[in-house]
């Protein structure tokens, strides 16, 4: 699987650029704020329909333009394919095309161009808030399981509606009459998310432990624990059981949610912990331990996606190697000898020998 070429129009700081890529390593070089990360964002968005930076689609449209266009040619699933996204500066919905045919949802292009992004912020993912860790799992699962993507979208839609009910009920108490209906549906969809996440994190933890053991020489025991609502004693239980578990938890917090006007419990609060030989990295891990564990998680994510899809996903390393010491740099580079890789950096140095070099300056290829 590899991205053969991409064309960007009015995307971020790119007015119009066409790029051909190597099926192996592509080194994207240039000073800061020239468009290197924008290019990786375009590649990631092409395959997933999700941005790792923008909160709104309009943020990706070049200033002064009405629309942005991202189009790529991919060799995947043993044939050439094309993907295209048209993003609009306003409320008009985006458009998706696969092999020239218009599609309705991002789930219809899942698996064509899966990507794994690794950026400097990910090095501290085990120290930051739970939302960042949830995004790690969600990004992978949405690409692996189109049904998960649909369930997550539905869950967030219901959660938003429930939040409005809780906020507006002070002025309109009758809204509370429909709250149980929303709680039931929220728990049904939330149970699906927990079921998917439990299996994903179980596999991710086992794979990450392998990579961590290779780097540390087995000196530390890596363990990952998925954490969801307290009434879920077995996240691998049938979805019907998980639904009831979530309903029980919501019943306990029903009055508190009404009083605070907040959705206090559910899979939108999920998290995971990583420990080394029983020591929780979130609370006690050193910078070196935390970075090595984060690297292991990203390599594990790539391995899992490759195993499930039969082809390795495209790896996007956004200025992350410069944040690592030589030992960790070598460890990462030794693990990515296969598949397509994009590496951004300001000073290419020792990396120029890895593959094709593309220099970016102010949204143009030099």
What residue ranges belong to the model's regions?
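Conserved NTPase motor "head" modules and their coupling/switch loops across ABC/AAA+ ATPases, GTPases
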Residues: 1-31, 173-314, 323, 327, ...
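Conserved lysine of the Walker
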Residues: 35-36
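Post-Walker A helix-loop "phosphate-sensing" segment adjacent to the P-loop in P-loop NTPases
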Residues: 45-57, 300-308
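Nucleotide-state sensing region of NTPase/ATPase domains
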Residues: 48-126, 130-132, 141-144, 148, ...
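A conserved P-loop NTPase coupling/switch region
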Residues: 108-115, 119-188
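Short regulatory helix/loop adjacent to the ATP-binding pocket of P-loop NTPases
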Residues: 139, 349-360
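Walker B catalytic acidic pair
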Residues: 318-320
């Amino acid at each position: 699987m590899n991205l053969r070429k991409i064309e960007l129009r009015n995307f971020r700081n790119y007015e119009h650029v066409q790029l051909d890529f190597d099926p192996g390593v592509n080194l994207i070089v240039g000073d800061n704020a020239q468009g290197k990360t924008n290019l990786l964002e375009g590649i990631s968005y092409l395959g997933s329909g999700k941005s790792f930076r923008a909160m709104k689609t309009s943020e990706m449209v070049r200033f002064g333009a009405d629309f942005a266009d991202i189009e790529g040619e991919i060799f995947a699933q043993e044939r050439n394919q094309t993907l295209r996204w048209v993003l609009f500066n306003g409320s008009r919905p985006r458009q998706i095309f696969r092999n020239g045919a218009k599609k309705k949802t991002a789930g219809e292009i899942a698996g064509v161009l899966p990507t794994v992004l690794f950026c400097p912020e990910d090095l501290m993912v085990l120290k930051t808030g739970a939302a960042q860790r949830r995004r790690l799992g969600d990004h992978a699962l949405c690409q692996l399981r189109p049904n998960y993507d649909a369930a997550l979208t539905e869950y967030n839609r219901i959660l938003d509606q429930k939040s409005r009910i809780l906020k507006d009920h002070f002025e309109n108490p009758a809204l509370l009459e429909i709250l149980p209906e929303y709680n039931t549906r929220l728990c049904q969809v939330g149970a699906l998310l927990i079921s998917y996440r439990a299996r994903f994190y179980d596999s991710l933890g086992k794979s990450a432990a392998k990579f961590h053991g290779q780097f540390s020489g087995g000196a530390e025991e890596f363990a990952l624990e998925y954490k969801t609502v307290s009434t879920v004693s077995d996240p691998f239980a049938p979805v019907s059981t998980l639904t009831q578990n979530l309903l029980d938890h919501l019943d306990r917090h029903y009055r508190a949610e009404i009083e605070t006007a907040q959705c206090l419990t559910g899979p939108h609060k999920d998290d995971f912990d990583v420990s080394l030989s029983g020591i929780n990295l979130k609370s006690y891990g050193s910078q070196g331990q935390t970075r090595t564990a984060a690297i292991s998680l990203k390599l594990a994510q790539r391995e899992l996606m490759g195993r499930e899809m039969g082809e390795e996903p495209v790896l996007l390393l956004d200025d992350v190697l410069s944040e690592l010491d030589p030992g960790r740099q070598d460890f990462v580079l030794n693990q990515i000898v296969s598949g397509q890789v994009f590496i951004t950096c300001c000073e290419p140095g020792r990396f120029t020998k890895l593959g094709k070099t593309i220099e970016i300056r102010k949204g143009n290829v030099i």
